[in-house]
């Protein structure tokens, strides 16, 4: 019966194949576009403000945006500050 099913089965149309491929491409792009376009500029602005008060290396600041559900986004900011210098009395 398997041989008969093989010859009688319908082959996928090119439209169905194209649709499946397009769905894969869209899913991959959605995964890659998780970072909003304004995030790099936001990081630069935050770094400028921090540098007004403390001298730090730009690599010491990380900014991440995390999706938690459909309507909740969490912005996480980590800043590694240098050790405080002691002021003479």
From Swiss-Prot:
Source domain of life: Bacteria
InterPro entries in the record: MinE (IPR005527), MinE_sf (IPR036707)
Keyword Iron included in the entry's annotation: no
Regions that span the bilayer: none
GO biological process: cell division; regulation of division septum assembly
Pfam hit, one: MinE
Keyword field: Cell cycle, Cell division
Primary role: Prevents the cell division inhibition by proteins MinC and MinD at internal division sites while permitting inhibition at polar sites. This ensures cell division at the proper site by restricting the formation of a division septum at the midpoint of the long axis of the cell.
Sequence similarity: Belongs to the MinE family.
Stated name of the protein: Cell division topological specificity factor
